[in-house]
C-alpha cells in the first residue's frame, strides 16, 4: 500500500515538473517576443541639407558582421546547452550535414538584431564574415537576411587565416581601402591585424534583456560621415580585450 502511494506521488511530481517546464517555456517565448518587437528607442530622422551634402562627399562604407555570439548564438542537438537557460525557446533551426552526419542547430537571435540589420543596411554595405563552416554560416545568414538581400556578400572559415588554433579575418581581402571598412566582432583575436578597423561587442548567449546592438546605432550613424573610420576607431583600442 505504501509503495503504491509512493509510486503515485512520484508520478504526480513528474507530471507537475513537466507542466512547470511547459509554463516556463511559454513564458520565456512571450517575454522574448515582447522584447524583440517593442518600440525601439533609436529614432531615425531625415538628414538635414548640410548632412546630406557631407554624406555625398565621402564614400559609402562597408560594415563587416560576425555571426556567432555577435548576432546569434546556437547549439546543436549533440552539444550540452550550458550557455542557454532551460526553457529558453530558439528562434529557428538549421539542418546541415557534417561529415555525413545530420546535425540540427538551434539558433537564438540576439535581441533587436532584425531592427539593427534593417537600419545599418541603409547606411552601409553589409558583409557577413564568420569563422564557421560555410554549410552552417550560409544557412544562418539566409535566415537573418530573410529575403531582404542585405547580406549577400559572405565570407566563411575557408576565407580566414589559421592562427594558433583560432582564425583571423583579413579585412583587406574584402576592401583594399581600409579607410572605409570596419568589423563588429565579439572576438578580438579575429581582427587582431586590424584593431583600428574594429568595434568590439560583448559576447551574447541568451540574455533576453541585451541591448548591445541598439547601443551601437548612434555611433554607427555618425561613423558613416567620416573620411576614414580609423580616425575614430583608433581611439577605442582600450575597449578591446587583450589577445
Swiss-Prot record:
Coiled coil region boundaries: none
Cross-referenced Gene3D superfamilies: HAD superfamily/HAD-like
Membrane topology: Single-pass membrane protein
Protein's GO biological process: imaginal disc-derived wing vein specification; negative regulation of BMP signaling pathway; nuclear envelope organization; nuclear membrane biogenesis; positive regulation of triglyceride biosynthetic process
Gene Ontology CC terms: cytoplasm; endoplasmic reticulum membrane; Nem1-Spo7 phosphatase complex; nuclear envelope; nuclear membrane; protein serine/threonine phosphatase complex
Catalytic activity, reaction form: O-phospho-L-seryl-[protein] + H2O = L-seryl-[protein] + phosphate; O-phospho-L-threonyl-[protein] + H2O = L-threonyl-[protein] + phosphate
Subcellular location: Membrane
InterPro entries xref list: Dullard_phosphatase, FCP1_dom, HAD-like_sf, HAD_sf, TIM50
Membrane spanning residue stretches: 11-27
Major site of localization recorded for this protein: membrane
EC number: 3.1.3.16
Single GO molecular function: phosphatase activator activity
EC primary class: hydrolase
Annotated ranges, domain FCP1 homology: 56-223
Record's keyword terms, sorted: Hydrolase, Membrane, Protein phosphatase, Transmembrane, Transmembrane helix
Record SMART domains: CPDc
Function: Serine/threonine protein phosphatase that may dephosphorylate and activate lipin-like phosphatases. Lipins are phosphatidate phosphatases that catalyze the conversion of phosphatidic acid to diacylglycerol and control the metabolism of fatty acids at different levels. May indirectly modulate the lipid composition of nuclear and/or endoplasmic reticulum membranes and be required for proper nuclear membrane morphology and/or dynamics. May also indirectly regulate the production of lipid droplets and triacylglycerol.
Recorded family membership: Belongs to the dullard family.
The protein's name in its UniProt record: CTD nuclear envelope phosphatase 1 homolog
Organism from which the protein derives: Drosophila melanogaster
Name of encoding gene: Dd
Amino acid at each position: 500500500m505504501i509503495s503504491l502511494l509512493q509510486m503515485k506521488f512520484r508520478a504526480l511530481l513528474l507530471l507537475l515538473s513537466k507542466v512547470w517546464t511547459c509554463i516556463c517555456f511559454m513564458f520565456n517565448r512571450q517575454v522574448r517576443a515582447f522584447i524583440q518587437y517593442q518600440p525601439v528607442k533609436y529614432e531615425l530622422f531625415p538628414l538635414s541639407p548640410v548632412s546630406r551634402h557631407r554624406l555625398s562627399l565621402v564614400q559609402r562604407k562597408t560594415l563587416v558582421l560576425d555571426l556567432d555570439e555577435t548576432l546569434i548564438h546556437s547549439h546543436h542537438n549533440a552539444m550540452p546547452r550550458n550557455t542557454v537557460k532551460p526553457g529558453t525557446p530558439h528562434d529557428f533551426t538549421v539542418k546541415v550535414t557534417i561529415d555525413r552526419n545530420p546535425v540540427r542547430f538551434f539558433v537564438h537571435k540576439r535581441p533587436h538584431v532584425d531592427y539593427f540589420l534593417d537600419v545599418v543596411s541603409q547606411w552601409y554595405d553589409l558583409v557577413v564574415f564568420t569563422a564557421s563552416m560555410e554549410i552552417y554560416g550560409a544557412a544562418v545568414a539566409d535566415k537573418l537576411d530573410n529575403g531582404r538581400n542585405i547580406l549577400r556578400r559572405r565570407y566563411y572559415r575557408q576565407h580566414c587565416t589559421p592562427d594558433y588554433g583560432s582564425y583571423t579575418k583579413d579585412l583587406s581581402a574584402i576592401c583594399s581601402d581600409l579607410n572605409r571598412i570596419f568589423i563588429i566582432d565579439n572576438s578580438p583575436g579575429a581582427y587582431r591585424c586590424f584593431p583600428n578597423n574594429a568595434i568590439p561587442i560583448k559576447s551574447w548567449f541568451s540574455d533576453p534583456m541585451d541591448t548591445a546592438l541598439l547601443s551601437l546605432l548612434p555611433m554607427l550613424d555618425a561613423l558613416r560621415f567620416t573620411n576614414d573610420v580609423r580616425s575614430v576607431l583608433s581611439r577605442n583600442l582600450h575597449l578591446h580585450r587583450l589577445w
